[in-house]
Amino acid sequence: MKGACVLVLLWAALLLISGGNCEICPAVKRDVDLFLTGTPDEYVEQVAQYKALPVVLENARILKNCVDAKMTEEDKENALSVLDKIYTSPLC
């Protein structure tokens, strides 16, 4: 499994251990969705809503390009599937 996919799964696991409250604000869900399935421009535009510093935006683009290059479509679908299961889990 690729490093970026592992990070997404670790983030998801932390949600489950964080006291059982998996309510995630829609903005975070949108960020994660764009990070995994959006274009680099869409993701950078989303990041710019929170922090429009050039260095932050450049790092966001580099990270998104890296994820797109390293993760397969199947990896991304698997990560989204895990997140969907967490969002709908009765443990949350």
Curated annotation (Swiss-Prot):
Leader peptide range in chain numbering: 1-22
Tissue expression profile of the protein: Saliva and sebaceous glands.
Any one Gene Ontology cellular component term annotated for this protein: extracellular region
Keyword Disulfide bond applies: yes
Highest taxon, organism lineage: Eukaryota
Principal localisation: secreted
Alphabetized UniProt keyword annotations: Allergen, Disulfide bond, Secreted, Signal
Record-level Gene Ontology MF annotations: steroid binding
Subcellular location: Secreted
Keyword field contains Membrane: no
InterPro entries: CH1-like, Secretoglobin, Secretoglobin_Domain_sf, Secretoglobin_sf
Family (UniProt): Belongs to the secretoglobin family.
Subunit record text: Heterotetramer composed of two non-covalently linked disulfide-linked heterodimer of chains 1 and 2.
Protein name: Major allergen I polypeptide chain 1
Organism of origin: Felis catus (Cat)
Encoding gene per record: CH1
